Design a protein with these regions (language model features):
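Short internal beta-strands
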Residues: 187-191
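Juxtamembrane luminal stem/stalk of type II transmembrane Golgi/ER carbohydrate-processing enzymes
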Residues: 1-162, 167, 406-460
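Short, well-formed alpha-helical segments that are part of the catalytic scaffolds
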Residues: 168-181, 185, 195-207
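Conserved beta-strand scaffold positions in the cores of enzyme catalytic domains, especially
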Residues: 186, 220-224, 290-292, 362
């Protein structure tokens, strides 16, 4: 009889994992649903209310998470290679003793009296969804299989964004402004060699030291790659893979106080994820990993919109990066997690079922991929710097390096092999035409937002 009762109890526990809790129950406690489904202890201590004090919901610190104070010029050079996260911070009280949670866009969600917690069902602003109006459209219309299990966190995750840079400084500036208040550390790798193996100046380091990026300097971890991998000149994919491997392993080793559930995202310099999606990953529990972003594709500028989306797996938690991908960014981007030897052990140790998903969809972009988006001089430099892997290597042909030829490619949207593409219509007023910082600084980035060589009908 006792054995029968035990079996019945075990079946009951198993059934819980398939139950969809009502929204009212899910909203009652951000940690209640996660305690049933994920079976993992919180990674940071929770702060108890003071005796006799009012209960409160905690306000996210995603816009107030500096890692280092800006450095004096005398110390800036020696500190480029170090970055330390502060100790754990629990989300703060709402001002004036009230209790409110914030929507992901910063608007208050609910408020209550002095002694009793009160939750109010939200009327969501356009672009936001869910019981607490914190789920952005790029998640609502994604293929995430666990949307009914999403709950706000009391302690935000830290977000690490890793990038290799060559000469994409305008796009890097856009990334810093677009994501600067939600990303906690930008790990940027620069080498004194191009991807082709030729010497190059350390331009990004120079810009860090001369103050060009002072507004974000406290969040930048500079990684210097001082060598070119053997065989990289003959096989460009060796160099391409090595850049991402070195970026990830060397960069992560220099970050202190990491937590297993911190978010790691590795991008190419011409890939910019949407802020709303990154903020969701920071503030919510219940999503699976690894994850990708559906990105709007464009060529030479945002004015040549290409069909479809770019969908590249580019993110996971720090725990998965280390346990499954051996802290190798190229494995994250190019290898299916279930082919990696550590994935089953990671599933068992965390209680998480690994299911790959993508933020956004082919109809709802979750970022931007702007390929060859430079001035003609920038495209020339990309041609001569490119790895010896994408064939034909157009930088080897003198006529393809001619600036007038490059200007004509930008004007027509053509490719180096002489082909022409059919482009969907692109309107600067469309929802995801370009990152907001670009649009707010239209004159400065006009060459990326309007075709500078388009011939106006009727013009002489």
């Amino acid at each position: 009889m006792a054995g029968l009762c035990l079996i019945s109890f075990l079946h009951f526990l198993k059934a819980l994992s398939y139950v969809t809790f009502p929204r009212e129950l899910a909203s009652l406690s951000p940690n209640l649903v996660s305690s049933f489904f994920w079976n993992n202890a919180p990674v940071t201590p929770q702060v108890s209310p003071e005796p006799g004090g009012a209960e409160f919901l905690r306000t996210p610190l995603y816009s107030h998470s500096p890692l280092l104070q800006p450095l004096s010029p005398s110390r800036a050079s020696e500190e480029l290679h170090k970055l330390e996260f502060p100790g754990t911070k629990v989300l703060e009280k709402a001002p004036a003793g009230g209790r409110q949670e914030e929507r992901a866009d910063g608007a208050p969600l609910s408020a209550g009296g002095a002694k009793r917690r009160k939750w109010v069902e939200c009327v969501c602003l356009p672009g936001w969804h869910g019981p607490s109006c914190g789920v952005p459209t790029v998640v609502q219309y994604s293929n995430l299989p666990t949307k009914d299990r999403l709950v706000p966190r009391e302690v935000p995750r830290r977000v690490i964004n890793a990038i290799n840079v060559n000469h994409e400084f305008d796009l890097l500036d856009v990334r810093f402004h677009e994501l600067g208040d939600v990303v906690d550390a930008f790990v940027v790798c620069e080498s004194n060699f191009t991807a082709y193996g030729e010497p190059r100046p350390l331009k990004f380091r120079e810009m860090l030291l001369n103050g060009s990026f002072d507004y974000i300097r406290h969040k930048v971890l500079y990684v210097f790659l001082d060598h070119f991998p053997p065989g990289g000149r003959q096989d460009g994919w060796i160099a391409d893979d090595y850049l991402r491997t070195f970026l990830t392993r060397d960069g992560v080793s220099r970050l202190r106080n990491l937590r297993p559930d911190d978010v790691f995202i590795i991008d190419d310099a011409d890939e910019i994820p949407a802020r709303d999606g990154v903020l969701f990953l920071k503030l919510y529990d219940g999503w699976t990993e690894p994850f990708a972003f559906h990105m709007r594709k464009s060529l030479y500028g945002f004015f040549w919109k290409q069909p479809g989306t770019l969908e590249v797996v580019s993110g996971c938690t720090m725990g998965m990066l280390q346990a499954v991908y051996a802290t190798d960014g190229i494995r994250l981007r190019r290898r299916d997690y279930y082919t990696m030897p550590g994935f089953r052990q990671y599933e068992n140790s965390t209680g998480h079922i690994l299911v790959q998903w993508s933020l956004g969809s082919p109809l709802h972009f979750a970022g931007w991929h702007c390929s060859w988006c430079f001035t003609p001089e920038g495209i020339y430099f990309k041609l001569v710097s490119a790895q010896n892997g994408d064939f034909p290597r157009w930088g080897d042909y003198e006529d393809k390096r001619d600036l007038n030829y490059i200007r004509e490619l930008i004007r027509t949207g053509g490719w180096f092999d002489g082909t022409m593409q059919e482009y969907p219509p692109a309107d600067p007023k469309e929802q995801m035409y370009a990152p907001k910082y670009l649009l707010k600084n239209y004159q400065r980035f006009r060459y990326l937002l309007e075709n500078p060589y388009r011939k106006v009908e009727g013009a002489g």
